[in-house]
Amino acid sequence: MDRRNFLATSVVSAVAGTVAGTASSGAAVAAPARPAGGVDGITVTQPDGLNPPGIRTAGVRMVPVVGGKYKVWTKKIGSGPVKVLLLHGGPGFTHEYLEAMESFLPQAGIEMYYYDQLGCGNSDQPDDPSLWTLPRYLEEVEEVRRGLGLENFVLYGHSWGGILGIEYALHHQRHLRGLVISNMAAGMQAYLKRTNAIKQQLPPALLAQLEALEAKEAYDSPEYEKIMMEELYPKVICRIQPWPDAVGQTLRHANNKIYNQMQGKSEFLMTGNLKDWERWDRLHEIKVKTLTIGAKYDEMDPEDMQKMAKMMPNASSFICQNGSHLSMWDEQAFYFQHLLRFLKAV
C-alpha cells in the first residue's frame, strides 16, 4: 500500500486531539471592503502600502505555470524584509504539514509563502504523467518566483522540497538570498543506505518478512502496512502521538500518482524517476548562504546533513537530537530556534 493511503487511514482517528492552533489551509474568498467612512461602527482602512486597493484575498494568489496552461496556489503570510518560499515534500504532498511555520516566522518579522506544487493540494491537478519530473518542477519553481515577484529571497525545501531547493540553487542562484535544506540528503544512494540500515534494526523475523514482501513488490499488502505503521514510521517519520492534524491533512490530500511515479510505492525503496538523482559532486557550486537541517532519528542520515554543509563554502548545519523526518513537529522548539536564527542573520 502506498504511503498516502495507509498513513492517512492511520491518522484519521488520531488527529482529533492534535496540536492546537494549526491554521486552516483553505483559500478563503474575501468580501468587498466597506466604504472608508465606516458602516455600523466598523471602519476599514483605506488602501495604502499594507492595504492595497481591490478585493482582499487573504494573501492567496494563483500563479500561472507550464507557460500559463495551469495555475498553482500560493499564500503569503506576514510581512518583512526576509522573504521565504516554502517547498513541501512528497513528491505529491501539500503545504499543510508545514503549517507550523506560521506560528513562528511571521511573529519574527519574516514574510513567508506557502505553495502547493502542480498536481497537489489547492493547485490545478492535471492527469498528465509527463508533468511529474524533476526538470519540469524545477522550471515551475522559477515560474512561481517570477509570478510572486520574489528577488533576493530565501528558498526553504523539506525532503523532496530539498531536492528542488538544491536544483534551484544550481540553476538560479542569482535570485537567492539564502537556502535551507531540511531533512534531505544530496543523493539517493545515501538515502537508500540509511533506510536499509533502519530496516536492519527490525527483529530478524520481521526483517525477513519485510524483505520477502518487498521482493514480491507487495507494498499494498496488510502485512507490509503493519510493519511500516507499527515498526518504522512512528520512529523515523514523526515521533509524537497522535500525529498533528496538519500532517494528517497532507496525507489525506496527497497525490499518489505523482508520488508513485517519482518516488515509487515504498518510502524505503526508490524505484521512481528520482532514483538516479545525485548532487554531491556539485554542492561546492552553491555559494549562497545555506543551512542544512537533520535529525537523529530521521530516515535521512543526520551525518549527511553535516557533510553537505561542509561541502558548500557558505553553509552551516544543525541536528535535532530528539527529532525525526518531521522535526518541525517532534522537536519543534529546537528546530525553530535555529531556523529563525539563520533567517534573521541571512
Locations of regions flagged by a protein language model:
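Active-site loop/oxyanion-hole signature of alpha/beta-hydrolase fold enzymes
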Residues: 114-160
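N-terminal secretory signal peptides and thylakoid transit peptides that target proteins
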Residues: 1-14
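Conserved HGGG/HGGXW glycine-rich cap/lid loop of the alpha/beta-hydrolase fold
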Residues: 73-125
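Conserved loop-alpha-helix segment in the C-terminal half of the alpha/beta-hydrolase fold
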Residues: 280-322
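Catalytic active-site module of serine/aspartate enzymes centered on a nucleophile-bearing elbow/loop
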Residues: 315-346
